[in-house]
Amino acid sequence: MRIVLGVEYAGSAFEGFQSQAHGRTVQDHLEAAIGHIAAHPVRLHCAGRTDAGVHATAQVVHFDTESVRPNSGWVRGVNSRLSSPVVVRWATEAGDGFHARFCAVSRRYRYILHNSPVRPALLAGRVGWFHPPLDEIAMAEAARCLEGWHDFSAFRAAGCQAKSPVKLMHEVRVQRAGDYVVFDFWANAFLHHMVRNLVGALVYVGKGRHSAAWLAEVLAARDRSLAALTFSADGLYLCGVEYAPHWSLPGEGRIIVVPRIPFV
């Protein structure tokens, strides 16, 4: 049978999601915990292979097993074997045709940026930081050019393994909540470092270094060297993965908010 889990984790505790020869990863940590409850080794597949330092409130993973457990048993059992930076939020059984990555129809990322002269202490590693004042209205205006089908080569990491740089950006939103600027990206899929590179470019606009028209020119040029530097991973969250309704998965993703008391 194929079991699907909804997972939340603090990425600052790991060297990314995907298993690697050296370094602590979310996948290795989860596989060890699930394997103990399943009573056999498991191999996980995820919706999004987040980088080192990137967080998730709504990662989706699946694995195959012959072990029979109630959904609540998978949640409680696996969580009992996990350390605090990772938690399983829900579990369900899916058909053999389900795949956490290839069946996903869209994904949502949120970047939370602390825009203040003083760096954050309690939220260090949980939000990005930029001290010069930013114009969120200018950034929101610039972001409109990103919506729709585009070749995002200008915002693609050199080592990106995606077959095509063309993606459908459903929506980009930029809004301020006090000292926080929140960037929301919703697309069918994302390239490696794409969100962090887009945030970097929008920050260039927000601080007045470039106009909104510049971002459209960079997008059209498809040249990575013309864009901004890659922004830090600290404030980036995978906060939603959408699937076709017939899979009947719990919820539609968990969107992290910016509370007055800044804990999540």
From Swiss-Prot:
The alphabetized UniProt keywords are: Isomerase, tRNA processing
Q: Where does substrate bind?
A: 109
Q: Which SUPFAM superfamilies has this protein been placed in?
A: Pseudouridine synthase
Highest taxon in the source lineage: Bacteria
Catalytic reaction(s) noted: uridine(38/39/40) in tRNA = pseudouridine(38/39/40) in tRNA
This enzyme's EC code(s): 5.4.99.12
Pfam families to which the protein is assigned, alphabetical: PseudoU_synth_1
Please give one Gene Ontology molecular function term for this protein: tRNA pseudouridine(38-40) synthase activity
Active site residues according to the UniProt entry? 51
One GO BP annotation of this record: tRNA pseudouridine synthesis
User: Coiled coil located at which positions?
Assistant: none
Q: Function of this protein? A: Formation of pseudouridine at positions 38, 39 and 40 in the anticodon stem and loop of transfer RNAs.
Q: Which family does it belong to?
A: Belongs to the tRNA pseudouridine synthase TruA family.
Q: HAMAP family recorded for this chain?
A: TruA
Q: How does it assemble?
A: Homodimer.
The protein depicted here goes by the name: tRNA pseudouridine synthase A
Q: Which organism is it from?
A: Aromatoleum aromaticum (strain DSM 19018 / LMG 30748 / EbN1)
